[in-house]
Swiss-Prot record:
The modification N-acetylalanine is found at residue 2. Interacts with PRA1F2 and PRA1F3. Interacts with the cauliflower mosaic virus (CaMV) movement protein (via N-terminus). May be involved in both secretory and endocytic intracellular trafficking in the endosomal/prevacuolar compartments. It comes from Arabidopsis thaliana. Residues 163-182 are annotated as: Disordered. PANTHER family: PRA1 FAMILY PROTEIN D, PRENYLATED RAB ACCEPTOR 1-RELATED. This is PRA1 family protein D. The lineage of its organism: Eukaryota, Viridiplantae, Streptophyta, Embryophyta, Tracheophyta. Keywords: Acetylation, Endosome, Host-virus interaction, Membrane, Transmembrane, Transmembrane helix, Transport.
Length: 182
């Protein structure tokens, strides 16, 4: 049983860190420049937050962990809440069932958010954690606005119009589409 838990934690951790973009790309100083307009900055923030979302999450988690290092009870609560998130939300493949009732993932997320906030308030570090997360988000948005997006791979920057802009033809007859005559 314990071996299965450790294996599950390892696999999920490798999956999460494997999804992170290379740190060399994240910190590439030659990719930084001032945006030409507010619209350009907004586009950069949106694209960089999408592209580097795992990197940003890792940085915020480390900052939050370092903030709590002076309060041992807060660290224990942080670990317990982190494990609850891991086992009840991230590492589950089948729906959560309690006493024969299937619990929706949205309800699980709301309950875990409540547990997270409750543990921050109970341990007395909510203001410190809120300040750290606020500062971290500000720095990450600044990074996202200043880092250019020209060199990013567009595999996760899909057009919201999807296949409507396809030029492959795909059996369609140009602008007419795939209509049959009357």
């Amino acid at each position: 049983m314990a071996n299965q838990v450790i294996t599950g934690i390892k696999e999920t951790a490798q999956s999460i860190t494997g999804a992170a973009r290379p740190w060399g790309d994240f910190l590439d100083l030659s990719a930084f420049s001032f945006p030409s307009s507010i619209a350009d900055a907004t586009t950069r923030v949106t694209q960089n937050l999408t592209h580097f979302r795992i990197n940003y999450s890792i940085i915020l988690s480390i900052l939050l962990g370092l903030t709590l290092i002076t309060r041992p009870i807060a660290i224990l609560a942080f670990i317990a809440v982190g494990l609850a998130w891991f086992f009840l939300y991230f590492a589950r493949e089948e729906p959560l069932t309690i006493f024969g009732f299937t619990i929706d993932d949205g309800i699980v997320a709301v309950l875990l958010i409540g547990l997270s906030i409750g543990s921050l308030v109970t341990t007395g570090v909510w203001l410190r954690a809120l300040t750290t997360v606020g500062f971290g988000v500000l720095v990450l948005i600044l990074h996202a606005a200043l880092r250019g997006t020209d060199d990013l791979v567009s595999d996760d920057l899909e057009s919201p119009y999807g296949p409507m802009l396809s030029t492959s033809g795909g059996g369609n007859d140009g602008a007419r589409g795939d209509y049959s005559g009357i």
